[in-house]
Structures are given as C-alpha cells and as structure tokens.
Amino acid sequence: MPTVSPTPTPTPTPTPTPTPTPTPTPTPTPTAEPIVLPTSFENLFERRKGISLAAWQKSSEVIKASKNKSGAFEIITGPNTTPNFDDYPTPISLVSRLFPARSEPAKTIVIRYKYVDLEWAETTLRSKLTAEEFTQLNRNEGGKAIAGRCDVSSRNCRGAMQQTTIAGLSLIIQGVPNEVDKSDPTSKLRFGSGMLEAHEYFHSLQRIPIMGAEVWPHAWFREGSAEWVQNMAVNYNDYKTYQEFLAIDCAGHCARLSEADIVEFLEKSKENYTPPNFDPGLNYNLSSRFIEALVALKGPDTLINIYEQMGKQLTFEQAFKNTYGVEWSYALPILAKTIYANLKD
C-alpha cells in the first residue's frame, strides 16, 4: 500500500493588532465678540458696531410698553386707485407708540391717488379745505399740492407729503405708483409694508411743536428722522429686517462718499438747503444713519425734543446742545467719522 503523507497543518496567520484611531482634537467654536453698546459721543466711534442694536432695542421697548393715542383718520382713495399697502392704522399706531409723551393731530385726512385720478384728487382736496387753507397749502407747495407728487412724462405718482393747516388739521397727500419700481431695492418695503405711511405721519408730529414759529431744523434732521422712524416703527419686532433696510437704503449714493464728503454735507446743510454737489436723497438714507446714532445715545423722544426747543426760538445748534448734551460742532466730526466707518465695514 502506498504510504499516505499527512496533510500539513497550516500555520495560523497572526491577527494584526489594530492601530488605535487618534482622538480628533476638537475645533473650538469661535466665540462671537459681544456687541458693546455706545453710551456717549466719547465712545460712539469705538462702539460703533453697537449703534443699530442700541437704537433698535431702546425704541422697541418704548413701542412695546406704550399704547396708541393717534387721532381720527379719514382715508380717501381715488376711484381708479388701488394702494400697495392698505392697513393704514397699523403703522400709524406704531409711530404713536414710539412717541408716547408727544402730542398728535386730532384729525388726519389722507388722499391717495394714481395719476389717472389726478383731477379727482385736486377736487377732493379743495372740498376738504376752506378757500384760505387751500390757497396757503398750494402756495407752500409751489402751486402743485397734488400734481407735485407726480411725474407728467411717465404719468406716474410716487411722491407723498404732509402738511398741517393753521387750524391744526393734518393732511397727507399720497401719490400711488402704477407699479413698484423693481430697480429700487427699497421699493417693496417702502411702498408695501407701511413705511411710507409711518414716514408721512411722523412729519405731523414734528410740526406740532413749531406751529407758528416758522423755524425748521436742518433738512437732513427732518427727513433723516422720518426715514429712520418708518423703518423702526414697521420693524420694531424684527431686528433682522430693520438692519437689512438700513443696508439697502444706503447702498447707493451714500456708500460712495468719503469721510470728508460727509463732514461737508453736515456742515453746509441748512433748513431747506442741500449743498448742490450732494444728492437730495442723502437727506433721507444717509441721514437716517446720523439719526440712528443719536437715538442710540439718547432715545427716540429726542427727535421731537429738537423741534420743541426750536419752537422756543432757539437755533438748531442751541437745541442740539440742550437735547444731546454736547455742542453740534463737537458732535459733527464724530458722527461723520463713525457713520463713514460703519458704511465701509
């Protein structure tokens, strides 16, 4: 018989010892630097990142703690006009609550119209005023109280204005555009959220302390205040949208200015005068940034206090010192430097 060779027993292959997986080093989550709120002109520039939050927080708290005290409203809309925004009481009540200690008109008449209703608006305005009141109002508006809100060439009405009669009746003449201007990034919010309504109504609060005094703060203060108030009132519960509007509102002309330009704008602007080398729109968009800084330091009521002071025949410079505690000549370069830096950051 053949000899059977034994089957060799295989040598076991040693199991490799697993290499331990190194424990990953945790990447620390970056800690956002806390926003420090400005408290004075002395630290306004250093704490400029906190300006928006300070102004918004102070004002939001006022609105939430206050009640609406606005007077009666008569809102008249042209027969062929459909407004972009039709909840008039809401923005009005928010402006009222932002200024709880301030007087408001006992009655406001609002006339809203598209270009197609131009003649209707003229007739309606005449029917609501005495002949003397209409003449005075039309004279104040260069004979174009109604037509002045519209552009004849494009047959479109985008303007609005507020006036107060000698008897204290508040009038808001409000052109309604045929369509929202898609080339203007602010149009959707301005015409569709209640901002325009808040803006014009605030002008009526400005007028009350200076009725009969024939004095006005600088144009940038007047319109910058209304531009800031419209944003604050509508967005008192939405800080993100408040910030977004600030950014897009100033993304054009004001973003291209140098610090020296801003100083010149503030130095040369007067009651109803804007230096000819500056776009009049700066009285609104850029100037709302100055106003925001002032509110961040001293609160929203100061915007009317300036008018109250000037109603006593004080100059803007005197009223500013009484309200904000420093000379206007001292505050001006600080505001210019601060706002310029925030626009560039």
Question: Where is each model-derived feature located?
Answer:
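Surface-exposed helix-capping loop/turn segments at secondary-structure junctions
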Residues: 98-106, 211, 299-303
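Zinc-dependent metallopeptidase catalytic helix centered on the HExxH motif
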Residues: 151-254
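Ser/Thr-rich, Proline-interspersed low-complexity disordered segments
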Residues: 1-39, 335, 341-345
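Short, functional N-terminal and low-complexity linear motifs
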Residues: 53-63, 192-198, 254-259, 271-273, ...
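Acidic/His/Gly-enriched intrinsically disordered linker/tail segments
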Residues: 212-287, 297, 307-345
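Stable alpha-helical elements in mature extracytoplasmic
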Residues: 84-91, 95, 193, 197, ...
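Non-catalytic architectural context of zinc metalloproteases
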Residues: 28-186, 190, 194-195, 273, ...
